[in-house]
Amino acid sequence: MATILLQAAGAMLGGVLGPVGSAIGSAAGALAGYAIDRALIDSTRHVEGPRLTGARPFTAEEGASIPRVYGSVRLGGTLIWATRFEETRTTKRQGSKGGPRVTEYSYFANAAFALCEGEIAGIRRIWADGREIDRNDVEIRIYRGSEDQPVDPLIEAKQGSGNAPAYRGLAYVVLDRFALADYGNRIPQFQFEILRPIGETAKQVRAVCLIPGATEYGLSPRLITQQKRPGDSSAANRHVLHAGTDLAASLDELQMLCPNLEHVALVATWFGNDLRAGQCKIRPMVTSRTSSGFSEAWTVSGVGVNAAVAVSWSGEGPAYGGTPSDRSIMAAIREIKARGLKVTLYPFVMMDVAADNTLPDPYGGTAQAPYPWRGRITSDPAPMRPGTADRTDAARSQVSAFCGMALRTQFATTADTVLFTGAPDDWGYRRFLLHFAHLAAAAGGVDAFLIGTELKGLTTLRDQNDGFPFVETLCALASDVRVILGANTAITYGADWSEYFGYHPADGSGDVYFHLDALWAHPAIDAVGIDNYMALSDWRDGDYSGPNPDGFREPYDSAGLRDAIAGGEGYDWYYASEEGRLRRERSPITDGAYGKPWVYRYKDLVGWWSNRHYNRAGGAEAQTSTAWVARSKPIWFTELVCPAVDKGPNQPNVFPDPKSVESAVPYFSSGGRSDLAQRRFLEAHARHWNPASADFNDADNPVSPLYGGRMVDMSRIYLWAWDARPFPAFPLRTDVWSDGDNCFHILTEIAENRSSRVSDRGRNRESSTVTTWSCVRVR
C-alpha cells in the first residue's frame, strides 16, 4: 500500500517539473514505498530453514562379527547404541532491524560403535565419509576393551543406572553430540585407525629418548602459529588432526603403546662448530635469522632469533632444525611430568660443520669432515698425529678453552628463559651444561640429568702428567649440577660403549687407563651411563649356504643374539683390522700378563662392574686401585637400539644420513629395511637383563650388596628413540622435515607393525611369527 501511495504522490510532485519530473518522482516514490512495505511486512515474517520431518533410521547389524586386530589397522565400526537425533533451533533476524526472523535447525547424534576385540592400545586417526576429522572439534570417548572398563556416562544417563552395558572385552567409541550438518544431517560412515602392538616388546619398554633435539618449537605442548602475511597463518607445531600439537600426539601414542613407560629422556640440542677443542664454540642456533610472525618468540639463553647464528645449509635447506626455545623445553618438561612420567634432561651436542668448510682438520685432512659425530672433538693436532697436543700442557689449555669459564652463579631465570650474566662471548661447554641445569630447575626439576654424552675424543685427552682434564671438568660439572638441582635428581654421563670401560691407546705402549673412574666414583654421580650399541651378530649372506661360526641359523637368530650380549665380538674375540673382518680372522681377547681379560672386553659388564680397577702405565699394573668401588653404582643404558635395517645387529651404532661423514649401513648390509632386526635385538636384551624373563640367568645381571639393586637397572634402559614428530606426518611430510628417509633409528617395532592389511577368516595367526604385518582376524 505504501508503494502505491508514495508512487502517486511522487508523480504529482514531480509533475510540477514536467513529464520527466513526473517520471522521476513516481520512481522515487515507488522505491521509498517499497522499503516501507518491506520493513512493515518482514518485521512480522518468520522464515524457517530445512528441518527433518522424521528420523533418518540407521540400524545395527545383528550377529556382526567382531574383528581381532594385530598391529595398525583401519576399520569401520558397527553401531551398537544410539539415541534419537538431538535438535537445536536458533532464531535470529536477518539483515537490518526490519529483516525477517529466521529459524535454523541443527542436529546432533549420540552413538556408540563397536570396533574390535579388546584390549587395544588406542586409536590414532578417525575418518568420516573418507575425510579425516579434527579430534579437537568433536567429543569422542574411546574404550579400549579391557575386562574392567566402566560404563560410559552418556549411555548410563540415557539408559538409566544399572541398565547400561560396559561392553567389557570389546573396544568401542562413543560419539557425544556429533554435529551432522556437514554430512547432510545423517550419521556418516566412520573408519578408525586402531593400534594394537604385537608381542611383549612394547610392554617391556620403561624408558625412551625423545627426539628430535633440534626443533625450535617442536617440543612445545602449546600450539604455536606463524603469520606469514596478514590473514595467512599456519601452525608451526601441529601437522596432524588427532591431537592439539605434534608433541601431544606423539606422547599420546607413546603412552598408548608402552603402558609400563616410566622415563622419558628429553633431548635438547646446541651446536658445536669445530672439531678442534680449543676453537669449538657450543651455542644455540636457528634455521633462519629472518623468521618472524610466530605467536611465541624464540629465545635461548637470552638470545633472540635475530641475534642467533643460523645453521648451515645442506642441499636445498637447513642441515638441522634449530635449538628448542627455552620456553618450549620448560613446557615440555612440565607436560611430560603432568602425564605421570619422569623426565631425564639430555643436553645434546650436534656438530654443524658444513661440507664446504675450510677448517683445519686435527686429524690431518684437507678440511674437517662434514657434520661429524661429537665424539670426534679432540686436541689439535689429534692424538697420534705428528706434533699432537695430547700428553702436553697444550691439551689441558685446549680443553680449558673448550669448557669456558662459566660459573653456576652466573645465570638468572625469568619466566621464559635462562639468562647468562657472564662474558657474552663465552660459548663454552660449561655455559651449555649449566644453562640446561638451570632450565631444569626453572621447570620444577627433573628426575635425572645427563652432563654429557659420547665425548670420547675429549675424555681420552691427557695432559703432561697423564691426567685427564676433561674428566676433571665433568666431575666439577657434576658437583655444580648437584647444587642446582638438589639431591633428588640423579646425575650421570652417557659414555660411548667403546669409552665407558677404559682407554687403551693404540700406540704400542701397553697403557691401560680407567680414565672415567674418577667420574663414575664421584659422589655427585648416581649411575654409570652407557650408550649401548654393541654388536650382537656377524652374519653374512653366505651363511645361508654355509655354517655361521656363531651358530646362528638366520640373521636374527633369537638365541644367538641373546648369547652375544655377553659373548662373541667384544667379549671372546675381536677383529684386528677391516681386512680381518672380511676374511673372518678372529683374534681372541686375552690378558696374558694379569689374567684379567675383562679389562679388554667392552661387553663384560659383570667383570668390569664387579672388580677393582688398576691402571697400567706402560703395561705395568699399579699397586693401588682407582677410585671405583666394585658393585657400587647401577648401570644405565642411556641409549640402546639397533637400526631397523638389514643386518642391523652386525653394527648397531651406524645410521644412514647422506649429508654426514658418519653415514653408513651395518657391516655386510644391503641397506634395506628390516623391522625384524630391531625387534629381535630388543627382545634379546630384554630376556638377558630382565629378572622376570623365563630364561633369565642371575649371573648375567647380579644384585649389588651395596645398594640392593641389579647391576643393570631395567627401568633405566633408554631406547633410542621415540620421535616427537607424530606418524604419519613424520616421516611422510618431507616438505616439512628433510630427514624422513633416514628414520631407521625410530622404534618401528614399538610404533608400528605395518605394511599390508591381511584378513584371515580360516586360520589362527596368533603365533609369534606375525611381526611386520597389520592383520585382522575375524571370529
Spans of features found by a protein language model:
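Polar, S/T/G-rich
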Residues: 2-4, 23, 27-219, 229-236
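Well-ordered, non-membrane alpha-helical segments in soluble/globular domains
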Residues: 240-251, 322-330, 426-435, 467-480, ...
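Short linear interaction motifs
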Residues: 101-119, 232-259, 312-329, 430-432, ...
